[in-house]
Amino acid sequence: MYNNNNDGGGGGSANGNTMQQRRKTTTRSRSKQQQQQQCTSENVIEKNQTNGAQNERLHFRGSSKDSALSTPLLPRSRSTTSAINSPSPLCCNGGLSILNCCRDVNCHLNAPLRGSVESSRSRRSESRQSSLTATPTTTPKQASPSPTISERSRSCSGSRSRSCSCDGRLVDCHKHSAAAAAASTAAPQFTVNLSIDLFSWTLFLLAFCTRFYKLATPPHIVFDELHYGKYIAHYMRNIFFFDQHPPLGKQLIAGLVSLAGYDGNYTFSRIGAAYAPDVPIFWFRFIPALCGSLLAPAVYRLLLEARLHRWAAALGGLLVVLDNSLLTQSRFVLMESMLLLASTLGIACLLRFQRCRLGSFQWLCNGSAAGVLLACAGAVKYIGFLALALAGYLLCRHLWQLLYDASLTNRQLWMHALSRLLLFVGIPIAVYIGVFYVHFRTLHRAGPHDSIMTSAFQASLEGGLASITSGQPLAVVHGSQITLRHTHGRTCWLHSHAAVYPVRYKDKRGSSHQQQVTCYSFKDVNNWWIVKRPERDDLVVGEQPDVIQHGDVIQLVHGITSRALNSHDVAAPMTPQCQEVSCYIDYEIKMAGELLWRVEILNRNSEGDSWHAIKSEIRLVHESTGAALKFSGRQLPDWGFNQHEVVADRDQVHEDAIWNVEEHRYTKTQDQRERERQLLSAEMIPTKRTKLSFWAKLLELQTKMFWHGKHLQAHMYSSLPHEWPLMDKGIAYWLDSQSSAQIYLLGNVLIWYTASAGILVYATLLAFYAVRRRRLCFDVSQHEWQRFLMAGDTFFVGYMMHYLPYYFVDRTLFLHNYLPAFVFKLLLLCFVVEHLDYLLRRHCSGRGVHLVRVYRLALLLWLLAVGSVFVKFLPLSYGARKMTIEEVRRLRWKDTWDFILQKNYALN
């Protein structure tokens, strides 16, 4: 037993030695593994530090079913852990949780994956500890995902470090890892992603084909091409013109046709006149047609930015293609297609801007683009500024929502507010002013519209009034012969003639029977008056000119009849609440003349106290009654030769009481028959045309553009806003002189009526949801409710902002004024169609699922009907096909559509 015990003991000793050797081997292998892990960890950390990463992050790549790790696990720092535990509405990388996930497991959106990473890490550590304490056993390998590029580089660096450590050369490990990190850093990181949206390109091609088909047909002047063509011709010859809308659209077309060789010599005489062979008709209509083609993909993009599904966005673009009114309006030299494109793209960029991170490159680009596009919309037509107002509403609403975000500091909120002011107020103002700067720099010659502007503005232009006033005296003195012009509003000059007021008017009121004083709209010899000091008897300029100053009292003597300007307490003929103004005739009765007028210079802060020709704006106040000489705006009857009435109003502060001297000369007469030479002083004579600053020109032109729109006359095809939604009245654009072929502005009836119904459906659903949610009944998900509100803020409010203001506009309106509102109505229709599909899918389950199929089938049939109506009315959009009278009659679906037949025979 003892020997056996000794043997057993010897065996035990041998076994013990073997175990000790195994432990030593295990210890050495463990130390090697720790060194390898340390080397690999240092390599990866060094690589991350080289790339500028502050915290080590865990990246993953998602697959179709499960997500798998694509990089080795690294220990997280406390800052990383705190970042993980702080929720944020966006990913750590600033992307959206739905579309642009940062694919980072440190992001709070990937918390389930992070849990799986932690559990896998714990399992690996436990398996490593068990392998070190127990006899190693062979275990099957777990399936791992295919390695990414970063994994391959890290595994290669790890293998190199392991080979180094196994050979005992651990120092070289750092050299290899540094070289690998430098190689990875030196590798180019710039990538370009090219993606093509087939829906967008398909819509563009469809719109392009319909807009550019026979673009030069008809080769005649169509509707407002008469006016816009004249303006473009004036741009070619640098001649000043007046238009009630900003000039950007006309500038773009003028720039293009100048490149095409147009010289501006063609005279746009009347609608229907044939273009000359040298007029590039195609290039005249190119930019409107191109903008009309781009409108379809722009609407598609806007609907995508509003979070509609792709099929609904494509439906919106297709409806733009299939609407006849948008087709017609974009094929000729008209401004609406440019206006609609700029407004649509501006709102789309705004919606994307609101989702970008503050200060990022995308944030800056989208915000700047939105500001420029919305400003361009307003610089094409003033209605475009309503889109800018809509943008302001959306920005204010978004800022209001940001106030509830506790994660934003006060500084960040101020940055949000100030940046929006800069992008959506500063940029539009700069663009708008820049457009008019180009306008004034280009149009520096006098033209046919000069008389609308003030004398100072006219004198600043080459030719015209400048050629008359360039050598005339500057200061108004005793003995000056002047013409007094009504400065603001209607252009006319203070005028008198030998005719007198009737003894009694039609309303049985009596008059003074004195000589008439009127305001005449044309140059005439009876517009001349002589300035006279009351205490002097002569009417000549002395050797030392007696300059009239602010506050001086004068008399105005009519140059032809030699009678002085008078007023008294007698009611004016057309404005009884004001005093009559006349030239005094001495009938040898007790009523003496009241001939004294006080000169008040209104802009003396800039022009001085001396009365100057052209630039000084004066008010003439009657000394006896305190009433100011005023243009009343009323027209006299036949006894007054239909000239305009001039009165004296005790309410002195009024724009119509402002006058200025336009033509002026000094004369000295020895007797009343002969005029002597003019007495001119060099220091008082302008040597060149009057200088007017850019800001003075801009302010005056803006004022005139605002007032001029009120004087437009009615048109036989004008319409009222309440007639637009159901298209009660269209517009005849052009009629062929040889047949009944014509161009008539009408929309696609099916689209217009369905879109009007969509407005009512949305308003009804909004009221229904609001009441139900007040009762804590939630018929739609929170996500769908937010989309519903967003569509209302963008499309419903946009429609109302572009439509309701026309009810308060006192001017001639046409159907094409409704097109900006119609586009927003069409956008809202697309959302309503998608929302109804959502409601059916949500609430119709089981046997009711067939209702979804029925709805979609009905939608498809409706779309086919829209295409059929579009094709049916194409002859009225193109005007290229000759139609018989019967064919025209068949297209008259409403009695209010006034189509035109040959020989100007209208359908009644």
Curated annotation (Swiss-Prot):
UniProt keyword Repeat, yes or no: yes
Gene Ontology CC annotation, any one: endoplasmic reticulum membrane
One biological process term in Gene Ontology: specification of segmental identity, abdomen
The EC number(s) this enzyme carries: 2.4.1.109
Principal EC category: transferase
Subcellular location: Endoplasmic reticulum membrane
Listed name of the protein: Protein O-mannosyltransferase 1
Organism of provenance: Drosophila pseudoobscura pseudoobscura
Gene coding for it: rt
